[in-house]
Structure formats: structure tokens, C-alpha cells
């Protein structure tokens, strides 16, 4: 196949064998968010480039290296969104839904785009579920976001595979004082830093803290600690968050090097990480961004949120074997009909069953075929039972119900009793 007819590198098709697990994950998250009182918002995937320069920061890796940016026919510079927070802030500002101190608890889902080197768990088109809360400034809402994700991990069966890391970045003023101290410390040891971190020291010094370079990590052991520069307000806020997590029984680790890769964060930052996915260990990350709305032209409005990577969490579910059996199986019952009269009867019968058992996944054979070929397709479908309707069954107004998994003999069930029978052996287990 020519290159022009293939998917772009790092932008993957999600095939029918994969989508049931995606839908299971997305459905679980959306139900949880509904239960906590969050409302969905949907934003465009393309925004003016200036939005991300103002929000993320012009000297971040995302803006400098990773954004998909192009000029449209009007000469406007547009960008495929690399993350969701900036677009969500733009939307609430544009529509005035946070004015007058209105509290908004929002969530969104969709693709994001970054021109990174594709590898396991990291793609150029990737999908996120994001949550943003506006006009609540206490540690209680920070705690709610973390408690909510903790509940999600329990629902998915992955709590033992993830770890919560916390830090506080303080206010912008406290961060500026710390940045000056860090720059002074590292500048005196410039020859011990790798080339990439020498560049970061000039453009975004705090990013040096999350380096993976061993020699730079060794230098940072004796570097000034951000916690020593925190303002009193941030310190009290952070203590309040930790007290609530302790009360909820959620274990956490304080990571003083956790700074996040976006300029707009302040006070609380957190990440859920796993050691099950190799280098791409962060599955959910977020924090507080109290100055972002004002930075983007709005009135002072507090904000806090997080985003979780769907690809990584789906991969984690697969790695841990946490794929529910009913998700792996896409069909419950497969009907085989032999002869035109049986096909006509099957159509009416199966539609009646669908009315009575709307959650039953019932597939009817299409394309006719011999008994052997239809039965082979029934087995390949993964269905628990095959329904058999031929001339004999048609004459007796019964249908054969044959187990395809495990033990059990075929039973002939009267048409008017079929729904009740399937409800007892399939729907109710």
C-alpha cells in the first residue's frame, strides 16, 4: 500500500476488536463523573495558535517543538489542540459561564495532538478525558478530584498498580523566588548538565527538576527545595489537601521534583503513575491553575483539573488482565436459520426478543450458508449460545438453544418462552 493510503505515523486506527474495552472505560468514567455532578463540554479540536502560546507558554517543549500548526486560507495560524485545559478556559470565557463567581464542574473527552516520537503509550494523536473546575479555591475540591480518580481505579481494578505523587508549586511569586535560587545553583554547575537541561535552564528552569538524565539528577540532590520557598497560603492549602487524603485513606508520596510540563500550574500538582508501562508511567495528571483565566484575558478565576490518557489506561487494563469477560465477548447469542421460511420467522422472533431483553447482544446470521458454516460463524463470534431454527423447529414452533462454551445439552425452547429462557441463562448469568 502506498504511503499516502496509510495512517499517519503515531496516529492509530482503533479497530473493532479494541473498541469494546475503550467504550467500557469511557462509559465507566462518564458515569462516575455524572454521579459526582460534573457536566460535559465539547470544544473544537482546532484553535487559534495564540491560545496555546498564551496559556501553555511560548518557551515550553509543547509550543516550541510539538504542536501541529498551520495557516488556513485566511492566513490565520491554527493549531490542533495539544491539550484540553486551554480550550476549555477559552470556551468558558467566550460564553461567560464563570462570570459572577459561578461554579462550573466540567469534563470533556477527545483527541489531542503532539508531534512527539511515537512509542508504546505515547502517540501523535492520543485521547484524553479531562476535568476542569472553576471558582472553587479550597483544598476540598483538589481532594475531590483525587478521591474521584481513586474511586475510578477501584472500579477498574487497577488500584494496586498506580501510585499518587503530590507536590505544591506555590504562588507565582513564591515560584519566582525559587526559580532564581535554582538558576543560581545550577548555573554554578553548568558543565555538569546535559545539553538539553542547559537549554531548559535558560528557557524554563523548573523543567530541569523532572529530567531523566542521570548526571543531572545527581546534581539536583543538593539543589534548593521548592518546599522551602512556599508562601504561607500555599503551605496551608497543601496541608489541607493532605489531611483530606489521609481522612479518605488514600496513600500518596510527596515528590518535590514534580513540576508538570505546563507553565500555568500553581499550588497543587499531582500525578498518578504506574510501573507497569515502562517509560510512559503517568496515566493521569493535573493540578491547580488559579492565574490562567486572568492570564487569558478574563477576571481572576480559580481553576483546578486533571487529564487522563485513555490509550495508557486501556493498555494498563490489558496488561493487568482487567478486561471484564463480557467486554472481551462481543456477542451473547448467535442465531442460525436454515431456509427462507426460517429466516423470515427468525426476523420476527429476534425482534421480539430484542424488545423484551434490550441488553442482550443477539446476532443473526446473514448470508445464509450450510449448517456447518453457520455454526462455525456462531462459534467464532464468541457467543455463549447458538440458536438453531430449521424446518423441524419451525414446524414445532420451537428453537434450539445450544451452549457453545462449557458443558450442556441442546434444548428446544418454545418461541414464547425464549426471552425468559435467555434472561435466566445469559442476561442474569
From Swiss-Prot:
It catalyses: tRNA(His) + L-histidine + ATP = L-histidyl-tRNA(His) + AMP + diphosphate + H(+). InterPro entries: aa-tRNA-synth_II, aa-tRNA-synth_II/BPL/LPL, Anticodon-bd, Anticodon-bd_dom_sf, His-tRNA-ligase, HisRS-like_core, HisRS/HisZ. It comes from the Bacteria. GO terms for biological process: histidyl-tRNA aminoacylation. Keywords: Aminoacyl-tRNA synthetase, ATP-binding, Cytoplasm, Ligase, Nucleotide-binding, Protein biosynthesis. Pfam families: HGTP_anticodon, tRNA-synt_His. Its main location: cytoplasm. PROSITE patterns: AA_TRNA_LIGASE_II (PS50862). One of its GO terms (molecular function) is histidine-tRNA ligase activity. It is found in: Cytoplasm. CDD domains: HisRS-like_core. GO terms for cellular component: cytoplasm. Disulfide bonds: none annotated. Its EC number is 6.1.1.21. HAMAP family: His_tRNA_synth. Belongs to the class-II aminoacyl-tRNA synthetase family. Homodimer. This is Histidine--tRNA ligase. It comes from Pseudomonas savastanoi pv. phaseolicola (strain 1448A / Race 6).
Amino acid at each position: 500500500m502506498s504511503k499516502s493510503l496509510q495512517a499517519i505515523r503515531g496516529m492509530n486506527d482503533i479497530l473493532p476488536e479494541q473498541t469494546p474495552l475503550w467504550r467500557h472505560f469511557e462509559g465507566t468514567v462518564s458515569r462516575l463523573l455524572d454521579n459526582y455532578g460534573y457536566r460535559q463540554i465539547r470544544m473544537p479540536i482546532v484553535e487559534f495558535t495564540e491560545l496555546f502560546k498564551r496559556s501553555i507558554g511560548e518557551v515550553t517543549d509543547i509550543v516550541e517543538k510539538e504542536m501541529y500548526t498551520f495557516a488556513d486560507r485566511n492566513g490565520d495560524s491554527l493549531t490542533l489542540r495539544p491539550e484540553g485545559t486551554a480550550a476549555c478556559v477559552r470556551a468558558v470565557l467566550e460564553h461567560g459561564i464563570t462570570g459572577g463567581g459561578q461554579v462550573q464542574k466540567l469534563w470533556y473527552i477527545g483527541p489531542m495532538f503532539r508531534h512527539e516520537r511515537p512509542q508504546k503509550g505515547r502517540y501523535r494523536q492520543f485521547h484524553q478525558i479531562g476535568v476542569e473546575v472553576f471558582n472553587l479555591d479550597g483544598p476540598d475540591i483538589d481532594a475531590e478530584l483525587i478521591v474521584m480518580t481513586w474511586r475510578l481505579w477501584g472500579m477498574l481494578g487497577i488500584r494496586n498498580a498506580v501510585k499518587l505523587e503530590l507536590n505544591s508549586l506555590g504562588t507565582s511569586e513564591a515560584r519566582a523566588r525559587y526559580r532564581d535560587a535554582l538558576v543560581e545553583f545550577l548555573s554554578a554547575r553548568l558543565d555538569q548538565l546535559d545539553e538539553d537541561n542547559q537549554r531548559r535552564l535558560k528557557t524554563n528552569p523548573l523543567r530541569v527538576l523532572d529530567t531523566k538524565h542521570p548526571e543531572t539528577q545527581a546534581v539536583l540532590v543538593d539543589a534548593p527545595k521548592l518546599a522551602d520557598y512556599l508562601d504561607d497560603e500555599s503551605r496551608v492549602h497543601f496541608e489541607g489537601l493532605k489531611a483530606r487524603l489521609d481522612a479518605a485513606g488514600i496513600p500518596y508520596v510527596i515528590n518535590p521534583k514534580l513540576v508538570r510540563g505546563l507553565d500555568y500550574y500553581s499550588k497543587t500538582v499531582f500525578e498518578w503513575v504506574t510501573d507497569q508501562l515502562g517509560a510512559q508511567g503517568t496515566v493521569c495528571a493535573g493540578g491547580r491553575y488559579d492565574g490562567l483565566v486572568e492570564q487569558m484575558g478574563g477576571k481572576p478565576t480559580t481553576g483546578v483539573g486533571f487529564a487522563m490518557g485513555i490509550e495508557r489506561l486501556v493498555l494498563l487494563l490489558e496488561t493487568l488482565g482487567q478486561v471484564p469477560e463480557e467486554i472481551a465477548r462481543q456477542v451473547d447469542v448467535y442465531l442460525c436459520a436454515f431456509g427462507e421460511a426460517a429466516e423470515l420467522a427468525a426476523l420476527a422472533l429476534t425482534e421480539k426478543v430484542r424488545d423484551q431483553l434490550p441488553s442482550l447482544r443477539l446476532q443473526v446470521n446473514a448470508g445464509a450458508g450450510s449448517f456447518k458454516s453457520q455454526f462455525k460463524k456462531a462459534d467464532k463470534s464468541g457467543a455463549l449460545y447458538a440458536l438453531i431454527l430449521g424446518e423441524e423447529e419451525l414446524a414445532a414452533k420451537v428453537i434450539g438453544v445450544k451452549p457453545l462454551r462449557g458443558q450442556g445439552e441442546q434444548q428446544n425452547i418454545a418461541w414464547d418462552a425464549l426471552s425468559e429462557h435467555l434472561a435466566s441463562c445469559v442476561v442474569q448469568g
